[in-house]
């Protein structure tokens, strides 16, 4: 009985939704089906008692069944109530793609012949629409796990080692509590990098004029935070932008907001800071940005971001990481369209930063 309660709690906490269905299916496999032979299976979130009663993610499963008296029949009559209790909590997840929009149809989109490989990591879509996620044409996606709040169109084009689930609960914004430091005074001059075959360096600071890197030119960013206040970052195809320990913050006001466009075959090697207020974040979009602001990161196989791309109000078009040399790329945006084949991984221990979603659960009581 205790094994049934333990496994039921772990399964329900890992699933994150349809808790009663998950727990009851598992306990029934142990021979304890709710309502059969006086068995009761009770599922509570949060738990009704114990150290985790105030944890909204904790799941409690109680399996009960009256047992006939044996020797105790000498001292009383009637069956003896026997119960087993278990509590499990979800572990931090291994998500690498999260679409935050709650109603877009779809919030995650992939079509044509594009192939997306999420190496050992999960994809989530918070949209309750049907479809919440679309994999059209002959496009394919491979992941560890796919979980969407709504429905999926093209599920047959998805390969997921640990399953594909619809109707799951929304995943919390992993960077909701992160805010960069106050920005310094801005340089309003437009910066254009034209020198083919040469490297131009840029220091951290605030830039309110556009930054353009033309084909054949290279822009090297020194470590630090770069604020693009109403300014666009434009990296042409066959241009190069590099930097270690950098965060690009796109902000603005009114009708003027920073955005980015990276052309096909641009060479991008940007790595997030491993400490500090923007730890683990390589691109950060202001939460006050108008919903639907367009970002186009379409460098393809030569586009490598090490860290999180966090654009909570952006419609992000993404293509990158084919043959990637980085092992840590997370994409969090309002909506996400894969416009080309991409490889993403989340071996991010060296950079730190927030985990996305849940993966497994562990027993705590």
Regions found by a protein language model. Name each.
Residues 1-5:
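Aliphatic-rich helix starts adjacent to a transmembrane/signal segment
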Residues 7-69:
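Short amphipathic secondary-structure patches
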Residues 20-27, 83, 120, 306, ...:
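Extracytoplasmic/secreted envelope proteins and their assembly/folding machinery
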Residues 31, 35, 74-78, 139, ...:
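Glycine-centered secondary-structure boundary/capping sites
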Residues 41-42, 91-365:
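Primarily marks folded extracellular/lumenal domains of secretory and cell-surface proteins
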Residues 43, 54-95:
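Small-polar (Ser/Thr/Gly)-enriched, low-hydrophobicity segments
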Residues 46-47, 67-69, 82, 173, ...:
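Alpha-helix initiation/capping motif
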């Amino acid at each position: 009985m205790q094994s049934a309660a333990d496994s039921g709690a772990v399964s329900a906490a890992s699933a994150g939704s349809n808790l009663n269905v998950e727990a009851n299916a598992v306990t029934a496999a142990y021979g304890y089906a709710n309502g059969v032979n006086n068995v009761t299976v009770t599922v509570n979130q949060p738990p009704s008692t114990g150290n985790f009663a105030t944890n909204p993610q904790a799941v409690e499963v109680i399996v009960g069944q009256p047992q006939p008296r044996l020797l105790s029949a000498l001292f009383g009559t009637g069956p003896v109530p026997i119960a087993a209790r278990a509590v499990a909590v979800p572990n931090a997840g291994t998500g690498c793609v999260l679409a935050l929009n709650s109603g877009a149809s779809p919030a995650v989109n992939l079509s044509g012949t594009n192939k997306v490989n999420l190496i050992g990591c999960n994809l989530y879509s918070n949209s309750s629409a049907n479809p919440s996620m679309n994999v059209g044409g002959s496009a394919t996606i491979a992941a560890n796990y796919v979980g969407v709040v709504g429905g999926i169109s093209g599920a047959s084009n998805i390969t997921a080692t640990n399953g594909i689930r619809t109707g799951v609960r929304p995943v919390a914004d992993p960077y909701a509590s992160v805010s960069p430091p106050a920005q310094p005074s801005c340089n309003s001059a437009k910066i254009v990098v034209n020198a083919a075959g040469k490297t131009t360096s840029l220091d951290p600071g605030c830039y309110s004029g556009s930054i353009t890197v033309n084909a054949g030119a290279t822009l090297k960013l020194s470590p630090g935070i770069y604020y693009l206040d109403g300014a666009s970052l434009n990296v042409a195809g066959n241009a190069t932008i590099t930097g270690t320990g950098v965060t690009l913050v796109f902000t603005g006001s009114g009708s003027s907001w920073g955005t980015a466009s990276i052309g096909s075959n641009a060479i991008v090697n940007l790595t997030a800071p491993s400490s500090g207020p923007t730890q683990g974040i390589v691109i950060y979009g202001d939460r006050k940005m108008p919903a639907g602001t367009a970002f186009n990161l379409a460098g393809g196989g030569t586009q490598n971001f090490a860290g999180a791309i966090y654009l909570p109000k952006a419609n992000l078009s993404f293509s990158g990481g084919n043959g990637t040399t980085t092992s840590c790329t997370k994409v969090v945006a309002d909506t996400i369209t894969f416009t080309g084949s991409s490889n993403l991984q989340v071996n991010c221990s060296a950079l730190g930063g927030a985990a996305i979603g849940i993966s497994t659960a562990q027993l705590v009581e």
